[in-house]
Amino acid sequence: EFRRVLFRSEMYMVRYADDFVCLFQYENEAQRFYQLLIERLRKFGLEIAEDKSRILPFGRYKGTKESFDFLGFTHYNATSHWGKYCVLHRTSRKKLKMKREAVKKWLWEHMHESIADTIEALNVKLTGHYRYYGIYGNYIGLQKYYKYVRQELWKSKRRRDQTYWLTWKKYMNILKIHPLEYPRIYLKSAY
């Protein structure tokens, strides 16, 4: 009802928990909604985080290089392989940094386990990462994360004995026997 009375053009809202993105066809309607949202939240003693909210021109006809972060992804305008407009998604820098720090900490905490056990547990973590972030347009990001994990695993296992017996060549031979989960795209459509 609220939408029909105040807004005449297309409007969409994507919401997850306490995060949401509102999409408007016209900028003036987005600005009006933003003001109404601030007033509405004020009635309940809440306020909007000014540093996390903004109105930005985005879409097929705007031709901007603007991007925004939502749910761990950076969303940006692009063209598909066929030259058609699409919105592509890549892992946001902030989330990627957090994931890297977490996996590095985990590897150092588990450096004294056997390499086979570590890889088995690590593959579960990698699969979860790929299933969430494995969408069309983000394959390079998945590869970078895979290479980072592979490198950190090698460093942690080398550090374990402090004799550095585990050369890169030996390590790659171990990975042939106990392979790390390789990146995979799970959602292939570009929308």
Model-derived features with residue positions:
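Non-catalytic terminal/accessory segments
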Residues: 3-191
